Amino acid sequence: LHRLSVLILLLLLLPDWVAAGSFSLVSVPYYNLEGYPLTSCVSMVLEYFGAKFNLEDLRSKISPLGWDDLASAITYLENKGYRVYITQLQIREIKNLLNYSEIPVIVGQSFRKPYDYLYWRLVIGFDDERGLVTNDPMIRNNYILDEEKFKSLWVREAPGITIVIVPKDKRLSISENSTVKNALLFYSNTRRFVYNSDWKSAKSEIEKYLKIYPDNPMGLNTYAYILLQLGDLENARKTIERVIPQYPLPYICNTAGLVYWKLNDIKTAGQYFSRAYTSSPSNKEIVKNYANFLASQNNIEDARDVLSSYLVLEPEDKEIKDLLDKLNNSK
């Protein structure tokens, strides 16, 4: 019934993207909890299945430390009576789930380009002429990605990372991929240990992750940062140099800046901080690190400019305002 009502509406309205070709679409409500793409996708799926929930309560359960946490999401869903499949699917398998079972599918991708950061989209339909129809938590509902673009963003730790959520009494002919699930949970654990500054435990978890995906740039970057915090500067340098030639992404350049700054290679550190900031001037961590680096080199005016530019975008950010006030009051 979900799909039938939508198809009738589509036929009446005749939107451009349904003009030709095979298509399917399920009627899924749209939510955008800013900064919480996984929580947003889970809320859409739950409401699709008729569950009652408080959105803020859901956010606090799935994102207890301020970011989407997969382990917390699995626990929450299983306690609510849902089965969670973490697996790898191909596009044709997603189409089959939509077309024959009317089940929306959460995919773990990058946001705009491979390996920028883990981002979750909800696939709600497809049009063979134009691509996959998604409820994108950051962009909009009914956001279409052509299949080639979709696949290019779907490479991450492993190609085809997928979360399928269904009521426990509904069984599907798909199997969970324990390798993918374990890797994602190892990384989730790593983030929690980093948050609590438990660097030895963080190192243990990220090493488990890297045994599964030894060349993953996100994992290597995190490993370099943890080694830096543990004072293992030489291995931190070797790790970041292993990943940055192929993936000079802003967050990796930022970590490289921190490593070389600690090694007192000021010239190289400045180059990497500058690259990170130029590519991502709205990233708070990059802004803080670059401003602190500039201030440490007595480039006070440049540091002020970096912080002031960020405050144009986020005028109420107290931490950045305090940093700027500290610089303004310095002699």
Model-identified regions with their sequence ranges:
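Cysteine-nucleophile protease catalytic domains, especially the papain-like/related folds used
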Residues: 20-96, 100, 111, 161, ...
